[in-house]
A protein has these predicted regions:
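Conserved, mostly hydrophobic/aromatic
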Residues: 18, 40, 74, 108, ...
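C-terminal accessory subdomain/extension
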Residues: 263-388
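C-terminal helical cap(s) of enzyme catalytic domains, especially alpha/beta-barrels
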Residues: 15, 72-77, 242-251, 359
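A charged N-terminal "starter" segment
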Residues: 1-103, 117, 125, 165, ...
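A structural signal for short, hydrophobic beta-strand segments that form beta-sheets
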Residues: 85, 258, 314-315
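Short, acidic/turn-prone active-site loops that include or flank metal/cofactor-
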Residues: 69, 87-92, 108-112, 132-134, ...
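Active-site loop/helix belt of alpha/beta enzymes
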Residues: 5-7, 41-58, 113-127, 134-257, ...
């Protein structure tokens, strides 16, 4: 493979791994269930346009983003697949939603009425998916205990508004990725509420072409919840709690290279705050990656990077642009050698566990100044560097 971006710091995006993860889900859901790939937040840091292009090539039926700007970016990048905006869009932007052929999630009757008025005024029709709050307590028509009948009536009223085409209806699970009994019961209760909503709407003559609720956790655990479409996010990128269960491969590998090596005497303090002191003669390597690149400062002195010769403990505080590693036991590592922060040899999940967070916080945090290098068939097929 040719040298990626002058071998400073980069994120390798393995499109073959992406294809593998997509096919794993396809085999699981069968030929009659649609596949929506979630590419919001720049495809969880992987590069939305490039990931969306690959998903479109693979046959994804739908894509999902968080905002109109994200949706427009995909359209400007040549993406033709249907796109669902999961988050809020101001009603004033409805003409753009229609122009760009974007489907909008609708989470309340008042919003539906505002979207309807804007669509009618523009002379077009806005395709929408109804969002139902069955237990996430975030966006969505409220249909839980004490609100079921009024919630269903509000959904029916929203679907009947002029200028709107209610193509789909969906909900979002709060703990479908957890294996304990309480979480399973909660997920099943959410699904039960959702199916009751569907039945109540069907009794009123309102049905939908696309019913969806299965996120990555439900994809791995609850095949009865696949309905018309699944909606994997983190599973698409091969990380998270279900990567092993679904036989997924990590798509992103964050890499850097050794820029400098120095040997220090015992008692030498390393980096800000003097949080590491050498105990013997110590060979320290400097990496051109820091917390401004997405290498979390909270990992300081708590993990190792991976070299071709083995793991190298990180030493001292991680700086904004640089970090230090201990090469004392790795005499063959030299300036210019590649190191892996996370990826195939060190899972991002393990670093997330150190930080008591989720792995996609780490992939999303890989900053825009880190070039994405796209690999397919062992060759570089694209690069992306976004500083603006």
């Amino acid at each position: 493979m040719e040298e990626p971006v002058l071998r400073r710091t980069w994120a390798e995006i393995d499109l073959d791994a992406l294809a593998h993860n997509y096919q794993q889900a396809r085999r699981r859901i069968g030929p009659h269930v649609k596949y929506l790939g979630v590419v919001k937040a720049d495809a969880y840091g992987h590069g939305a346009i490039q990931i969306a292009r690959k998903l479109e090539q693979l046959g994804a039926d739908y894509l999902a983003v968080s905002s109109l700007d994200e949706a427009k970016e995909l359209r400007h990048g040549g993406i033709q697949a249907p796109i669902l905006i999961l988050g809020h869009t101001p009603p004033a932007m409805v003409p753009q939603l229609i122009e760009y052929r974007i489907t909008q999630a609708v989470s309340a009757l008042a919003k539906a009425e505002a979207y309807s008025a804007a669509a009618v005024e523009s002379g077009g029709t806005l395709k929408v998916h109804i969002k139902v709050d069955t237990g996430m307590s975030r966006l969505g028509f409220l249909v839980r205990e004490g609100h079921f009948d009024t919630g269903v009536e509000s959904i029916a009223a929203a679907c009947a508004l002029p200028g709107l085409e209610a193509e789909g209806i969906f909900t979002h699970f709060a703990v479908s990725d957890e294996d304990d009994g309480d979480s399973e019961a909660y997920t099943r209760a959410q699904f039960d509420v959702f199916t009751r909503v569907l039945d109540a709407l069907a009794a009123r003559g309102r049905t939908f072409a696309i019913r969806h609720c299965a996120n990555s956790g439900a994809l791995a655990r609850y095949p009865e919840m696949y309905l018309d479409m699944v909606r994997p996010g983190i599973a698409l990128y091969g990380v998270g709690a279900d990567a092993q269960r679904l036989d997924l491969r990590p798509v992103m590998s964050l890499k850097s290279s050794v820029s400098t090596i120095k040997t220090f005497d015992p008692g030498t303090d390393v980096s800000y705050g003097r949080t590491f002191r050498t105990q013997g003669r110590t060979r320290i390597g400097v990496l051109p990656i820091g917390y401004a690149d997405g290498f979390f400062r909270g990992l300081s002195n708590r993990m190792s990077v991976v070299t071709a010769q083995g793991p190298a403990p990180q030493r001292g505080r991680i700086c904004m642009d640089m970090s230090m590693i201990d090469l004392t036991g790795l005499p063959d590592v030299k300036v210019g050698d590649e190191v892996e922060i996370f990826g195939c040899r060190q899972r991002v999940d393990d670093l997330a566990a150190i930080l008591n967070t989720i792995p996609y916080e780490l992939t999303c945090a890989v900053s825009k100044r880190v070039p994405r290098v796209y690999i397919e068939g062992g060759k570089i097929v694209g690069r992306s560097l976004r500083l603006l």
